[in-house]
Amino acid sequence: MTLSEESHLPKHVAIIMDGNNRFAKKNQMQKGDGHREGKNSLDPIVEHCCTRGVQALTVFAFSSENWNRPAFEVDLLMKLLEEAIHEQLPRMRKFNIALRFIGDRSKLSEHLTDLMTHAENETAHFTSMTLTIAISYGGMWDITDAAKQIAKDVSDGIVDIEQIDTHLFGRYVSLNQLPPVDLLIRTGGDYRLSNFLLWQAAYAELYFTETLWPEFSIDEFDHALAVFAGRERRFGKTSEQIQQDKIEN
């Protein structure tokens, strides 16, 4: 089989876009310039995912923990996020991509949340791919929020407590209308998930690279896809069972 075959291509790719500040320091730039370079690095990856046939791309733009950064950097990141949304809309129309956002919107400015809602509404009918940007997001927040929603539905008589299982719980977390994450890529050299998509990436293949996000290229993205294609995904089964399933199917 070739990499281009659907069985070898991840349906859902997630990326922790790490390394902007280190890129700026490495190149004797201001922090803001590093983040701006990182913003620009997303565009070719989005287009490439769409042309390759990836169904969903989810990127970590601003975490729950990022609120702890210096105020000037948070303000800069919020401004860049607004710029990115404005810049992405024409690309979404051109490539027929739906744009979505996940995260705790209660901490965001009204202007930014209105812009996010507008972008979602403008692209809701596009079907080639779904690009999701995680802003003010944390996996633990996501799971806790889902638990609160379930508790309310139990209290309101909508859900019986005996109905609660992983399938039902999964309907309450973010990205519940998308396939589970197949491949999670982290740039920047750290080897951790940093509280990103803890539920959705439970069975994801992980690809870590020392490459800083502003330097992450389409060639390395394709290498990550090739690594993914070479892995055997067992989901608790043995290799023998997987081989037998392939024969039978």
UniProtKB/Swiss-Prot annotation:
Binding site for substrate: 19-23, 31, 35, 63-65, 67, 69, 186, 192-194
Residues annotated for Mg(2+) binding in this entry: 18, 205
Superkingdom of the organism of origin: Bacteria
Enzyme class: transferase
GO cellular component: cytosol
InterPro entries xrefs: UPP_synth-like (IPR001441), UPP_synth-like_CS (IPR018520), UPP_synth-like_sf (IPR036424)
Active-site positions on this chain: 18, 66 (proton acceptor)
Record key words, sorted: Cell shape, Cell wall biogenesis/degradation, Magnesium, Metal-binding, Peptidoglycan synthesis, Transferase
Keyword Nucleotide-binding: no
Cofactor note (record): Binds 2 magnesium ions per subunit.
GO biological process terms held by the UniProt record: cell wall organization; peptidoglycan biosynthetic process; polyprenol biosynthetic process; regulation of cell shape
Cofactor(s) this protein cannot do without: Mg(2+)
One Pfam family of this chain: Prenyltransf
Subunit structure: Homodimer.
PANTHER family, alphabetized: DEHYDRODOLICHYL DIPHOSPHATE SYNTHASE 2, DEHYDRODOLICHYL DIPHOSPHATE SYNTHASE FAMILY MEMBER
Function, in words: Catalyzes the sequential condensation of isopentenyl diphosphate (IPP) with (2E,6E)-farnesyl diphosphate (E,E-FPP) to yield (2Z,6Z,10Z,14Z,18Z,22Z,26Z,30Z,34E,38E)-undecaprenyl diphosphate (di-trans,octa-cis-UPP). UPP is the precursor of glycosyl carrier lipid in the biosynthesis of bacterial cell wall polysaccharide components such as peptidoglycan and lipopolysaccharide.
Name of the molecule in the record: Ditrans,polycis-undecaprenyl-diphosphate synthase ((2E,6E)-farnesyl-diphosphate specific)
Name of the encoding gene: uppS
